[in-house]
């Protein structure tokens, strides 16, 4: 398969919302390769929302939200094979791994979108780790009283990147994922309601609320 490269810095957009941070190359290529083998062995099933079956497949640990009853139902605990990733995220943020109460692994087949939403209120801060394929996250104010395309911020998510949504970015904004061009996986880690995570320390490959927020994604083969 041809290698796909993306240019993430060819357009300047408004700053990211407060509480939103993205870092590139959170995982090394070797870590990504090993983690993909772990993810592909998980028992995925189709995501469902109020009777609708989505194209996205998921594996949920530490609870599964039932959208028909709006309740959090039990699900298996996180498998030990995901502990190295959880621990790496915890070190990045300077927190104890036990603060992550929920892990959701999602598989996006080519062309799979994720609609506008805020994450369920049972959880607080969100950390996402991106693998294999690139994606575009869109963010807009919540509630969107008079939604316009010009009000949407677009954030390119390259493979091996990680992002944080906490505080205002978590509660005052919605996000969605544009239809993906290639197979991708994401691992989302969440804390319990009321347990807000700190932002990670600044680094050279990090986009922060006061800096560049989005880019057009160009694929070159």
Over which residues does each language-model region extend?
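Non-heme Fe(II) oxygenase metal-center motifs and adjacent flexible, charged/small-residue loops
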Residues: 1-221
């Amino acid at each position: 398969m041809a290698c796909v490269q993306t240019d993430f810095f060819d357009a300047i957009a408004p700053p990211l919302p407060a509480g939103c941070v993205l870092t590139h190359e959170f995982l090394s290529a070797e870590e990504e390769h090993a983690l993909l083998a772990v993810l592909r062995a998980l028992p995925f099933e189709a995501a469902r929302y109020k009777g609708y079956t989505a194209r996205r497949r998921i594996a949920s640990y530490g609870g599964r939200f039932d959208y028909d009853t709006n309740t959090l139902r039990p699900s298996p605990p996180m498998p030990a094979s995901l502990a190295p990733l959880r621990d790496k995220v915890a070190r990045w943020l300077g927190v104890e791994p036990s603060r992550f109460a929920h892990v959701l692994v999602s598989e996006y087949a080519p062309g799979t979108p994720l609609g506008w939403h805020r994450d369920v209120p049972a959880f607080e801060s969100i950390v996402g780790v991106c693998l294999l394929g690139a994606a575009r996250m869109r963010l807009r104010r919540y509630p969107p009283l008079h939604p316009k395309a010009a009000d949407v911020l677009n954030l390119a998510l390259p493979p091996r990147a990680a992002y944080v949504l906490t505080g205002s970015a978590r509660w005052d904004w919605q996000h969605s994922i544009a239809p993906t061009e290639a197979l991708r996986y994401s691992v989302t880690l969440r804390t319990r309601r009321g347990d807000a995570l700190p932002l990670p320390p600044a680094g050279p490959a990090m986009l922060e609320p006061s800096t560049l927020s989005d880019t057009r994604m160009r694929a070159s083969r």
